[in-house]
């Protein structure tokens, strides 16, 4: 099971770099389809990517700060999972893409509202964040500090 979950993480990491990869094997449509782009605001928990992918018990409001800090320190990409189960990867609005970790690190383990340009392509979601703020009224289930 751990091998399978590890493989899932590797596949998702590839999806960050090549968004169409996840459906390429099962989808016969062109991988060159343009991404859908819109201005939007999302709300979710800033966390590392490993836990929501590998831990099937993970939710948008439940986390271990000890694990989160260790994964972030080790370089795990940061993402924003929402209450409805969507996972948003932060990207730059310019090419080449620049590191968005600096923008998210102050919000690690916090529930946020992020506004910007949202991109969707074949089930993968990304956001070029223009504005981000912590939402204080969300009850988080934090296992440890």
What are the residue ranges of the model-derived segments?
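Bacterial N-terminal signal peptides
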Residues: 2, 6-20
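OB-fold and OB-like single-stranded nucleic-acid-recognition modules
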Residues: 22-145
């Amino acid at each position: 099971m751990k091998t399978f979950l590890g493989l899932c993480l590797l596949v998702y990491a590839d999806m960050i770099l090549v968004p169409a990869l996840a459906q390429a094997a099962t989808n016969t449509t062109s991988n060159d389809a343009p991404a859908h782009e819109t201005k939007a605001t999302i709300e979710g928990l800033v966390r590392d990517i490993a836990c929501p992918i590998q831990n099937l018990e993970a939710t948008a409001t439940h986390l271990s700060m000890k694990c989160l800090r260790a994964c972030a320190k080790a370089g795990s990409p940061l993402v924003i999972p929402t209450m409805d189960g969507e996972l948003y990867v932060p990207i730059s609005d310019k090419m080449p893409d620049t590191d968005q970790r600096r923008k998210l690190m102050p919000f690690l383990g916090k529930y946020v509202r992020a506004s910007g340009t949202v991109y969707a392509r074949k089930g993968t979601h990304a956001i070029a964040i223009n504005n981000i703020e912590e939402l204080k009224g969300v009850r988080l289930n934090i296992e440890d500090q």
